[in-house]
Each structure stands twice: as structure tokens, then as C-alpha cells.
Amino acid sequence: CIRDSNMVAQSYVRPRLKPGDEIIVSEAEHHANLVPWLMVAEQTGARVVKLPLAGNRLPDVAALGALITPRSRVLAIGQMSNVTGGCPDLALAIRQARAAGMVVMVDGAQGAVHFPADVQALDIDFYAFSGHKLYGPTGIGALYGKSERLAEMSPWLGGGKMITDVTFDGFKTQPAPWRFEAGTPNIAGVIGLSAALEWLEETA
């Protein structure tokens, strides 16, 4: 999830931020879904706005509407807390963010193993999870992105099979998602994660 959050922050969000723009991040976030936004805010002059917790120790999504302004650009929120195991009302949070034209990044590291999010029904722009939280190997995970969002993203890393052609005058990249797979892929990790997902499906 850390790599995924950073890739979304740097490759999709950063080129679209201007000084004074706002990134709303819930107070319940693991720093994997906080630090990338603090970094991109520092780089662009944007600012991170904290979505506070409610009395139940979950993000107060009912208060989100009051935080959204014409400068709000991104909502970063976790599917499930890594501390309490509590789950915010994602549907309500996303509806408010999407109504304001915001991009939504959901950290699914904790929740994916328990109840995978329906990314299309919830209208999630980006959703990330880690392999080891699904009984798979470490060092592997996945990032979902809407096809139109991925098509608008520039590559974060370069080299390997993410290009179709390269000369000293320039290069051409593969279409998404392959242009985000620079270098030799984690082949063993992919096989291990695939086996873990198959096991989860069989035992569900």
C-alpha cells in the first residue's frame, strides 16, 4: 500500500495540485496513507486537512461536508482501522467527495481480507491493498484505478518493459497498467499472492 499511495500521490495528484489546494485525510489513517500526502503537499504548496474522529473512534464522515471547500481535491481514507478494526461509512464519505469533484484514494490493506470493497459500486478512484494482509507473501500488493484515471497518470518509474520504444531522443510507454511496471516484476510474489487469493476464494 505504501508504494501505491506514493504512486497515486506523485503520478496522478501532484501534477494537478496548486498552492492552496486541499487534501483531506482521516485522522484514523495508517501513515502509509498520510505521509505520501504530507510529502506532496510540501512539494506543491497544497495543505492536508484532517478529518477528525467521531465518538466511536471512526472517521467522522458526517462532518466531511463541512470540511469540503472549492479547493478540496483529494479524500484519502482507510477501509478499516489498523488499530481498532472499525470501519467508516465509506459510501457516505465517497458520495460527498465525488459530489465535490474530489479524487478518492482508499487504503484497503486492513479491510480487503475481510470484505473486499466493490470499487465500482462505491465509485472509488484508487484502491490499494497489501499481499501479506491476505495471507500472501510480503513485498507484493495491488493498486486498482479507474481506467480513465490510470490513462491520465504518468509513469512513476522508468525502464524495463514499461516502454515500447526508446532512443536518445525519447521513449514511448506501454498503455496502462503496464507502463507502471518498471523493471523485473516480483514474479515469486505474484505467484504467491495469486495462490493466497485462490485459497481465500475457496474458503470464503
Regions found by a protein language model. Give the residues of each.
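Pyridoxal 5′-phosphate
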Residues: R3-A204
